[in-house]
Amino acid sequence: MNATIKEIALPNKTETFEFGAIAKQANGSVLYRCGKSVLLASVCYESDERVKEDFLPLTVQYIEKSYAAGKFPGGFIKRESKPGDFETLTSRIIDRSLRPLFPKGYAHPTQITVMVLSAQNDADLQTMALNAASAALFVSDIPLRKPVHGLRIGKINGALVVNPTTKEMSESTLDLFVSGVEEDLLMIEMRTLASDEINNTCFVGDCGMVAASASDILKIHQANEMKEEELLEALELAKTSIKKASACYVEAFTPLAKPDAILELKPDITSSEIYQYIKENHAIAIKEAITRMAKSERHSDLKRIAKEIASSERAQESEWSFEAVYETVGKYKREAVRALILEERRRADGRGLKEVRPIDIQTNILPNAHASALFTRGETQALVVATLGGDMDAQSYELLTEKGSSKERFMVHYNFPSFSVGEAGMVGAPGRRELGHGNLAKRALEPTIEEWGAQTIRLVSEILESNGSSSMATVCGGSLALKAAGINTTALVAGVAMGLIVEAEKHAILTDIMGLEDHDGDMDFKIAGTSTGITAMQMDIKLGGLSMEILKEALYQAKEGREHILGIMEKAQSEIIINDEILPSLQIFSINPGRIVDIIGQAGKTIKEIIERFEVAIDLNRDNGEVKVTGSNKQKVEAAKEHILSISNQEAPQRVRVADVYSAGEVFKGKVKKIVDFGAFIELPKGGDGLLHVSKIVQHRDQRIDEVIKEGEEIEVQILSINKNKVELGRATRPN
C-alpha cells in the first residue's frame, strides 16, 4: 500500500499520520499512531442530501474496540454494542471542537467516525481521537481547512505540563483539556484533582514545641481549587502549544487535501423587505415574546406573529412564503435580543448584565430519601437527591487502557424530562447531553468530598423546570444535598453559566444566562467552584474562537456571580436538618487477619448468621483484617461490630492438621456433628471433622440418612483416606 506518512513532534509525544492507504472510499481518512496506540478516523457526508431543519447535521462516533487492548468485551455477549460513558463523552468532545468550523447553512448529513484499533496502557485517547478526526476532516473534500488541535495540561508539583503521561496525571492537581485552531480557543474542559496531604509537622502547644506522634499525624484533604490567574496561565500555555501544532498541521496536511467539493449551502431565505415590515409593524409584539420565560410559550408567540404576517395583505401582494416570514421573524428576534444587551446593557427579563436571577433553596423535602435539595434559580429548578450506600453499591466499569475493572463510588445522574420546558416527549434512556451535564456536575463536586471510607454516593438531579443553566443548578443543588446527607466536604460548590454577545468591536458578558441568551449568544461558558477557587469549567464557542482578553473578563465576572450564589447557599446550609434516622450507618475497624476465618465460619455459616441477625452488609479484607459493616439502622450496625469484635477476641480454637494426628485405617468412635444431603460430618476424637459419605450410610436410594443415624449420636467409623487435610470416613461396622 502506498501511504503518505507525516510525523509531527509535540511536547512529550510524537504523532504519526498515514494517508491514502486505509478507508479510501471515505471522503477523508487517516490512520493515526502515537506510541503503540493506533486510531482510524474517517469523514463521510451525503453530497446529494440536505436537511431542512435549522441545525448542523453532524454526528460523531468514537468507538473503542476491546481487541485494541487484548481484551474480550465485558458482559454476557462478547461483542461491542452500546457505547460506554467514556466513549459518549469523548464523542461529545470531538463534536464540540469541530462543530464551530462548519459554515452557516451547511446542511449535508456528515459523520465522523474514530475507531481505536490499538491502545497503549498510558495513552490519552481523547486527545488522540480529536487530533485524528481533525486530520481526517482537513484532508477531506469538505472545504474546511482549519487545523484543530487538542491537548491536555496537568499540574505536577506546581509546574504545568503539556501532554502529561498517565503516571504524571496520577500526581496532577489539574486536568485541563483544550482544543483550538491557530490562535483561537474552541472548547475547554477543566477540573481540579483532589489530593491528601500528610501533616506530620510539629505543633506548638501551651507548653511550647511538641513533636507530632503517630496518632497526631493528620491527613488533610485538598480540593486544589484554581485561582482565576492560575487558570489563565494554563490557558496561555495551551494557546501557545495549539498555535504551534496548528501550523505544523497546515504544513503537513495541505498538500494531501482533496480538491474542494462544490457543496450547496442552505440559502438565506430571510428578506430585507420582510425585516423592515416586521420592524415597522411587529417590533413591540416580538419584544413581548422575548420576555416570555418559557421556551414553548415564546416559540408559540413567534409562530403566531409569523402566521399573522404571512396572512397579511402585504404578504399576499408580495408573495411572501411562510417559511421566509418565519425565518425573518427569528432573525429579527435574535438581533433584538442582542441589541438590547449591547446597546441598552439590559436583558430580556429586565436584569443587568451581571445580575443573577432570584434563588430559592429547600433541603430534605423528601421524608424517605437519604437527603435532598430543591434549588430554584429564576425559571430553572433542579431537585437533587442523594443516596448513600456501601462498597457493594459502587458502579463497576472497565477502561480500555486499564488492567482490570475499577469502581465508581461517586455518581451524578442528570435527567432532563420534556415537561421541564413545557413540551410532550419520549421518556427513555439518557442521551449524550444528559450524560455530559451529569459528568460536568460530578467533576465540579468530586474534589470537595473529604472522606470516602467504604461509602458510595449517588446524586440524581431531576430538572423540573429549565430556562438555562440547569447543569449549574445541579452543581448547587448537589453540593447542598451532600451537606444534607451529612457528607464531609471541604466547602460548598456553586456553579454559574456565562454568556457572550459579540458584534464588531462591541461585546457583553452575561452572568447566569437563560435559554434565550444561550440560543442567540456566542458562547456557553459554565464555571463551578468554591469561595477559594474553581473546581470545574466547560466552555463552548460558537464564534470560531475566543480571545484571551474576553476569557479573562468572563472568568472574573463569573467569580462575582459564584460568590453571590455561595452566600445564599451558606444561609441555606445553616438551616439544614439532617435526617439521622434514615441515613445508613457505616463502621470500619480492624481485627487480626488470622481471625477472618472465624468471622466467616464453616461454609460461611457465622457471617450469614451475623448478616441475617443484625440486617447488615459485611465486607472483609483477608489481607489486612479490615472489616466494613453497613446497614440502615445505626444501633444494629454497632451491635454487629461488637459481635464481630467479641468473636475475634475469643481464644482462637486449636486447628488440627489431621495428617499429623491420624492415619488411614484407624478405627474410633465419633459424634455425628451435622447431617447434610451428601452425608454426615463426624467429629474426630483428637480434633477436626471427617466426612462419612451417604453411600457409606444408607443401603438403598429411598432410605434417608436420618433414618440410620442421628445428630449427636456416637458411631464407630474408620479413616479411609486423608487428602489435603480432608478426611474420608467409612463405617467400621455396617448396621443391619
From Swiss-Prot:
Pfam families: KH_1 (PF00013), PNPase (PF03726), RNase_PH (PF01138), RNase_PH_C (PF03725), S1 (PF00575). It catalyses: RNA(n+1) + phosphate = RNA(n) + a ribonucleoside 5'-diphosphate. It is found in: Cytoplasm. GO terms for cellular component: cytosol. Mg(2+) binds at residues 518, 524. Residues 665-732 form the S1 motif domain. One of its GO terms (molecular function) is 3'-5'-RNA exonuclease activity. InterPro entries: ExoRNase_PH_dom1 (IPR001247), ExoRNase_PH_dom2 (IPR015847), ExoRNase_PH_dom2_sf (IPR036345), KH_dom (IPR004087), KH_dom_type_1 (IPR004088), KH_dom_type_1_sf (IPR036612), NA-bd_OB-fold (IPR012340), PNPase (IPR012162). Its EC number is 2.7.7.8. Its main location: cytoplasm. The keyword Calcium does not apply. PROSITE patterns: KH_TYPE_1, S1. Transmembrane segments: none annotated. Its cofactor is Mg(2+). HAMAP family: PNPase. Involved in mRNA degradation. Catalyzes the phosphorolysis of single-stranded polyribonucleotides processively in the 3'- to 5'-direction. This is Polyribonucleotide nucleotidyltransferase.
